[in-house]
Amino acid sequence: MFGDTSEVLPVAEGKGSSWPTQRLTMTVAFADGDRTWSFDLFSKLAGLALLSFAALFIQRRLFHPLRKYPGPWLNSLSEIPAAIALASGRQQAYYRRLHSRYATSSGTIVRVAPNELSFVDPNAWQDIYNRKPPHMEKHPVFIGAVAKVGGAVGISMAPLATKDHSRHRRALGYSFATSALVEQQEIILKQVRNLISHLKVFARKEKAIDMTDWYTYTTFDLMGDLVFGQPFGCLDGEGPTEWSRAIIHVFVSGAWEQAIRRVAGVNTWAESVLKKILIPKKVALWRRLHFAKSRETTLKRIKDGQRNHKDLMYFLLKNKEARQNLSDLEIMINMVLLVSAGSETTASTLTAWTYFVCTNRSVHRRLLKEIRGNFKTAEHIVWENTQPDQLPYLEATIHEALRLVPPPASSQQRVVPPGGAVICGERIPEGYAVAVPPVAVTHLDINFADPTGFHPERWLPRDDDDWDEKFAKDKLGASQPFSLGPRACLGKTLAYFELRLILASVLWNFDIDLAHAKETKDLWTMEDDMKYLKGYLTWVKPPLPVRLQEVKREA
């Protein structure tokens, strides 16, 4: 039993306060009788904690090197607000609100954490991600979805300051060269045609279909075939496989781990404990499944050698320098990264693009005219016929979809190198984290007119009939969906190739409309900080139900 007692102590006459002094005690029942424990120790600890907080407050608010940059006072004291924003999937909305709130006092810089600055000046892309050596490295706190395995890292974590990153990028670059992608075209077209054949079945049945699911099935099968030499089987199975279902959890788990490291530090006991407590077991299990399956399939594909299937591994194994530069474990880690990033991110763009086009009738009409006017048959929709100069309006709509829903949903932090760096004219001391938030930078009116509206015309030449003068001051360089510099997305060309082929094929074959327009618009609205879109490094997408009507053509 616990009970409280208080003892009034007398005050020496003529000295001190006239108020009685009390000492709080607690009586605890033990088997061998009552013992009285004093709270003196607890009060001292509380006082010490209060003193520590006061010292922290004074240091981080009054003497910290980043003190002049505005932001919420709690963010300047603790990593917790930024960690919660990331773990909840709402970092993109939170950072946009912060930049909007502090725009008048800071211009384009906000202190989002004690040791981190966020920039929405388009010039920050160059200053942070594409600067001359010494480059800004990733910090262990901000490791993404794929971390170190058995002492080895993939291209995403290989340090720029060593030869490791260039070694990885050079080895993988052969597989992503334009010449290699042209040779891989049949693999891509096979999955695109498979998608179209399934969509035709739904169109004939006049049934609504969730394009969020079907685009995801397509990109998973496509990346499985390109990376591992075999599709996941989502399209033919008309649903997700166990493996493909695991991939989104790689990003969710990665976001949670990053949030935990923000608060607990790197490789600490607190990090280990919080991971076990906070990360759902299901998420951790799915992540382990993805790594196990990837390892097994990669090693099998390496053993198969240069079989007559021109996937990414074919070109990596074919090039002796590339094969010698990477160990089997490094190849496996890179394949995990490629299939994860290449499937979910492209599916997000496809789905967002379809929503925007279905809700903008004038855009839809011009796209139909361009695509159906350029191709007499579906077989003509190939690499050489879908280049930007041939389908300029399709290209503009893709750029606009990537601006509104960029593939990386969260900031990609970098650490200022020794000696400090100048970012957007500001001298930033070494050791601090800096980043451009990809959503905030494109959703603010300081960079784009009507920033949450879908306006492909902003990407068109000024002599185009749809050009509007209100977009004359748009800072198009603020949109960098594939980042810049030595860590820019290796699969950028592949992503554009997939987007052009899939989207052109869908609009050439079908008339498409939203099935549940009001509900779907609520889910996909860009207003209210995209309140139904969650970003865990990449996007967790809401449903997109549509109705398809197959276009009938004379034989």
UniProtKB/Swiss-Prot annotation:
Q: What is its EC number?
A: 1.-.-.-
Annotated transmembrane regions: 38-58, 141-161
Its GO CC terms are: membrane
Give the record's pathway.
Hormone biosynthesis
Q: Which cofactor does it need?
A: heme
Which residues bear sugar attachments? N325, N360
Q: How does it sit in the membrane?
A: Multi-pass membrane protein
- The first-level EC class reads oxidoreductase
Q: Where in the cell is it found?
A: Membrane
| Record-listed heme binding positions | C489
Tell me the domain of life.
Answer: Eukaryota
The answer on whether this UniProt entry bears the keyword Secreted reads no
Q: Which Pfam families match?
A: p450 (PF00067)
InterPro entries, per this entry? Cyt_P450, Cyt_P450_CS, Cyt_P450_E_grp-I, Cyt_P450_sf, Cytochrome_P450_monoxygenase
Which SUPFAM superfamilies does the entry link to? Answer: Cytochrome P450
- Gene induction: Expression is induced during the early biotrophic stage of development. Expression is positively regulated by the ABA cluster-specific transcription regulator abl7.
Which keywords describe this protein according to UniProt?
Answer: Glycoprotein, Heme, Iron, Membrane, Metal-binding, Monooxygenase, Oxidoreductase, Transmembrane, Transmembrane helix, Virulence
Q: Which GO terms describe its molecular function?
A: heme binding; iron ion binding; monooxygenase activity; oxidoreductase activity, acting on paired donors, with incorporation or reduction of molecular oxygen
Record's keyword annotation contains Membrane? yes
| Gene Ontology BP, a term | biosynthetic process
Family recorded in the similarity comment? Belongs to the cytochrome P450 family.
Biological role: Cytochrome P450 monooxygenase; part of the gene cluster that mediates the biosynthesis of abscisic acid (ABA), a phytohormone that acts antagonistically toward salicylic acid (SA), jasmonic acid (JA) and ethylene (ETH) signaling, to impede plant defense responses. The first step of the pathway catalyzes the reaction from farnesyl diphosphate to alpha-ionylideneethane performed by the alpha-ionylideneethane synthase abl3 via a three-step reaction mechanism involving 2 neutral intermediates, beta-farnesene and allofarnesene.
**Protein's UniProt name:** Cytochrome P450 monooxygenase abl2
> In which organism is this protein found?
Leptosphaeria maculans (strain JN3 / isolate v23.1.3 / race Av1-4-5-6-7-8)
